[in-house]
From Swiss-Prot:
It is found in: Nucleus. It comes from Mus musculus (Mouse). The gene is Ip6k2. Highly expressed in brain and lung, and at slightly lower levels in liver, kidney and testis. The keyword Heme does not apply. The lineage of its organism: Eukaryota, Metazoa, Chordata, Craniata, Vertebrata. Belongs to the inositol phosphokinase (IPK) family. This is Inositol hexakisphosphate kinase 2. One of its GO terms (cellular component) is fibrillar center. One of its GO terms (molecular function) is protein-containing complex binding. Pathway: Phospholipid metabolism; phosphatidylinositol metabolism. ATP binds at E229, N230, L231, D242, D405.
Amino acid sequence: MSPAFRTMDVEPRTKGILLEPFVHQVGGHSCVLRFNETTLCKPLVPREHQFYETLPAEMRRFTPQYKAVLIFVRCADEFGASGNIETKEQGVVSVRFEEDEDRNLCLIAYPLKGDHGTVDIVDNSDCEPKSKLLRWTNKKHHALETEKNPKDWVRQHRKEEKMKSHKLEEEFEWLKKSEVLYYSVEKKGNVSSQLKHYNPWSMKCHQQQLQRMKENAKHRNQYKFILLENLTSRYEVPCVLDLKMGTRQHGDDASEEKAANQIRKCQQSTSAVIGVRVCGMQVYQAGTGQLMFMNKYHGRKLSVQGFKEALFQFFHNGRYLRRELLGPVLKKLTELKAVLERQESYRFYSSSLLVIYDGKEWPEVTLDSDAEDLEDLSEESADESAGAYAYKPIGASSVDVRMIDFAHTTCRLYGEDSVVHEGQDAGYIFGLQSLIDIVTEISEESGE
């Protein structure tokens, strides 16, 4: 059984697992689902799947760990689906679309484990929704569910689905206008659980993707997802910066219209000038106890100076600059640049670079503190006074730099590509060098 499924196996067979939206998704338009604490589900794009399957060894530490392929296959009824894992060891899940009490679409996975690792196929009754799992209210979701005429119900159901789709489009338009948002966080609570219904970008991507999947269920037999490492799982308050890298975003297979649109976006943003632009940001501001969200529409409007200020804001917690993070970031950016300079014929068109660190404030502890103080460190509340730390727990200064999104990546290993490039991806490397220069400038100006 794939390691990604061990968590599911300990659950009773009648219980389901809610495939939640990944609340720390700050950019992109693909729906990313949280499979478990350490694993994410992302819609499979053949080219991206090929990239992970043929990934050069020296690039692995700069990308999320690739785990498996998950296939959702439509069940006998229009609202059900089953899935299996394409790994050396087989595992199977059944999935269904349901609605929560707020009428939002949910995708539920039910583990099906047979003897000796074989697959059990069960009838649809085993896929009934579990009220405890989804925290349903006892009231009926549809007043029309009790109607005798099925045609009336179907007509009403289709009408409601169209209204939902239209509402999602309106909410996305609102998101485009609301380019920077703030959300107050309770310090004692789990940040990820608090954000389940409040990260505006991940929620809208989630609902839009599930709505499309449900609408297309009658015309499509299966959906494929890849399982990837959840890069934010080891951070208590993940601060995430999504940077669109390179001077060119369209793939070689893009239509003329698509290519022209991507060229225009690059020309009108910092992509053309410095080879990088902000695609999304989530940062914790300790001064106000708020998470700040910046979306890609704001990122496109930034000047080079505005980009630098956004980068400064990402490393600033509202009280002081997190200077201890700048050195590790520079080290990893420099190492990544050296690795990419050795990659022949690769082009990472429309790929992003994630920078992640923990926004949790760690209390100041002196070096002569007793063992009990150090043992209880992770449970103490944040120190309200700003200043340098005499002692930092392991991970307090940890920062991660990873490449993601390879749907338009190409190299000569992909034999079916009509265009084969020579040498390095100069546009991506140019963007990395710009990042290195700007972070270095921020570090020097702050007295690092």
